[in-house]
Regions:
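Membrane-proximal basic amphipathic "stem/tether" segments
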Residues: 1-67
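Mixed-charge, polar/low-complexity N-terminal
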Residues: 12, 20-21, 25-27, 32-33, ...
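Weak global preference for isoleucine
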Residues: 15, 22-26, 39, 93, ...
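A conserved helix-loop-beta module that forms one wall/lid of the active-site cleft
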Residues: 48-138, 142-159, 166
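Internal hydrophobic scaffold segments of catalytic domains
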Residues: 3-14, 100-134, 182-204
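A sequence-composition feature that detects small, non-aromatic residues
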Residues: 14-16, 25, 30, 74, ...
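Glycine-centered flexibility motif
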Residues: 41-43, 87, 190
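Phosphate-binding site of ATP-dependent enzymes
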Residues: 110, 136-205
Length: 205
């Protein structure tokens, strides 16, 4: 016998998803304010922004969409040209290939392990430890869906919508069979202020 509560919860989730989509389309600002309130339990002040997190929302809505350099640096492929231009080519992770579709990839030419990423989004990644164990059908389906996704529209981060969707395959960086410790430096007004250390990551990159 089916669980009526489960059906009710699925229905409520479907309604919530539909409402989020409608609010995003009608008023991205209203959506971001609702999202901010839900996550932080604070009202989102944008005129002017006061909290650091409010300033991030202001940039997301009103500044980044007008600055092509933000899209340039957010793109996983395009940012490589910028890094090279700035003289830091030695800091780039080696790339095995850049592709416009999954079916362009010649897996026989790739090493045993690597990382596959979409150029135009965050979180659209797949870590491959052993290509012989890959479920190519599942990967193909996943990346075809990702490449068709307008990530900027999905997340209300419009600068992502300017990035050409591609698949980039990079060398897998690992330490003793695990992902390495990641260090993120937060820079404010040109000065490094905070160090964020990420450890114990699984498949989420």
């Amino acid at each position: 016998m089916s669980n009526p509560n489960l059906k009710e919860n699925k229905f409520k989730r479907a309604i919530a998803v539909s409402l989020r989509g409608i609010i995003k389309a009608i008023s991205p600002v209203a959506y971001v304010k609702c999202q901010y309130r839900y996550i932080t339990h604070h009202k989102c002040h944008l005129n002017p922004p006061v909290r650091y997190t409010e300033k991030l929302q202001y940039l997301r809505l009103f500044v980044y969409p007008k600055d092509d350099n933000v899209s340039l640096c957010a793109g996983r492929v395009s940012v490589r040209d910028y890094v090279e231009y700035r003289g830091y080519v030695d800091s780039l992770i080696p790339v095995y290939g850049v592709y416009n579709s999954f079916d362009e990839i010649d897996f026989s030419s790739l090493p045993k392990s690597f990382v596959m990423k979409c150029s135009h989004a965050s979180g659209f990644n797949e870590i491959v430890w052993d290509k012989d164990a890959m479920d190519l059908s599942a990967s193909r389906k996943r990346f075809k869906k990702w490449l068709k996704t307008d990530y900027g529209k999905k997340t209300v981060e419009p600068h992502y919508s300017k990035i050409h969707p591609q698949i980039i395959i990079e060398k897998l960086l690992e330490e003793d069979g695990a992902l390495p410790v990641e260090y993120k430096i937060h820079v404010f007004n040109g000065k490094a202020k905070n160090l964020y250390v990420v450890t114990g990551r699984g498949e989420d990159i």
